[in-house]
């Protein structure tokens, strides 16, 4: 399976609780922080909820 590099680009301040919890579930706590996760449907769904807040890159 491929992996995804997810980077938080926008602040969680002022966002609805669902977006904040999704960021934290992905392991994103600070602006500019990146995490590498497996590319699967669950992670893709979480990214879709907060797509306006994150950048996503495929890592080989």
From Swiss-Prot:
GO molecular function terms attached to this record: structural constituent of ribosome
InterPro entries tied to this protein: Ribo_uL30_ferredoxin-like_sf (IPR036919), Ribosomal_uL30_bac-type (IPR005996), Ribosomal_uL30_ferredoxin-like (IPR016082)
Key word Ribonucleoprotein present: yes
Cellular-component GO terms for this entry: large ribosomal subunit
Keywords associated with the record: Ribonucleoprotein, Ribosomal protein
Database matches in SUPFAM superfamilies: Ribosomal protein L30p/L7e (SSF55129)
Coiled coil region boundaries: none
GO annotation (BP), single: translation
Stored Pfam families: Ribosomal_L30
Domain of life: Bacteria
Matching HAMAP family: Ribosomal_uL30_B
Complex and partners: Part of the 50S ribosomal subunit.
Family: Belongs to the universal ribosomal protein uL30 family.
Identification of the protein by name: Large ribosomal subunit protein uL30
The gene coding this protein: rpmD
